[in-house]
Structures are given as C-alpha cells and as structure tokens.
Amino acid sequence: MQVKSHKPSKQRKYLYNAPIHHRGKIMSAPLSEELKSKYGINSIPIRKGDRVKVMRGDYRGTEGEVISVDRKRYRIAVKGIVRRKADGTEVPVPIHPSKVVITKLYLKDEARKRLLERKGVKVEEIVEESE
C-alpha cells in the first residue's frame, strides 16, 4: 500500500517525476453528459483522435480533434486551435486535458476497447453505433 501525501509540494513533485505509464492515467478528461449516460463512466484517458470541446480559457467553446498528446508536459493539441508566431508559422496551442470535455471517443484502438470492456461496456454495440 502506498501512502499519499497531502502536501501540495509533494503532489507537484509527483507530477514532475511521474513515470510515463502513470502520466497517461493522470491525463484523463471528463466525458460529455451524453457519453456519460451512454457508457456509464465519468472520465477516460485522452488519446489522439478523440473529439473534444474546450470548456475553459481563451478558446472556450472551440471543438476539434486531438492531434497530439504530450505526456511530458501534460498538454494536448487540438486541431483548429493555433497561434501564429512572429515569422508567420502556425503552432498548436497546448491545452491541459482537464480543461476539455470529450464529445466523441476514438474507438478504433484495441486498448481503448479493452479498457471500456473492463469498465462494463459492450464494445461491439458501440462500434456498430459509431459507424
């Protein structure tokens, strides 16, 4: 059994030093109300290919597909949310996964299907509905 600390400094230290297989779990995002009722789960680790809606910050209300997940910096990039650099090139704006809501799950991933099955969802029905 691992003892957890309540100290904010130790919580930050854990985030900075967390191994990559823990970082994926930490980078979970809540599901939309529709998906919550459909799958019976509140949140799931975010992955490339999911459709998300930004709920906080300057880009609130923007919806798009996740184009990259940066586990080192705990940020995601969403298609359509870009910032123009001084030389004119566009770069994706990093967004924290807790500030978005997943509106559509990417279900072509076998690991994601196994995860949903573990949580009690019948994946065959899901795949048929999404196609």
Swiss-Prot record:
What domain of life? Archaea
Q: Which Gene3D superfamilies did the record assign?
A: 2.30.30.30
Pfam families attached here?
Answer: KOW, Ribosomal_L26
* InterPro entries per the UniProt record, alphabetical: KOW (IPR005824), Rib_uL2_dom2 (IPR014722), Ribosomal_uL24_CS (IPR005825), Ribosomal_uL24_euk/arc (IPR005756), Ribosomal_uL24_KOW (IPR041988), Translation_prot_SH3-like_sf (IPR008991)
Known role:
One of two assembly initiator proteins, it binds directly to the 5'-end of the 23S rRNA, where it nucleates assembly of the 50S subunit.
Quaternary structure and partners: Part of the 50S ribosomal subunit.
Q: Which family does it belong to?
A: Belongs to the universal ribosomal protein uL24 family.
Q: What is this protein called?
A: Large ribosomal subunit protein uL24
> What species is this protein from?
Korarchaeum cryptofilum (strain OPF8)
Top-down, what is the taxonomic lineage of the species of origin?
A: Archaea, Thermoproteota, Candidatus Korarchaeia, Candidatus Korarchaeales, Candidatus Korarchaeaceae
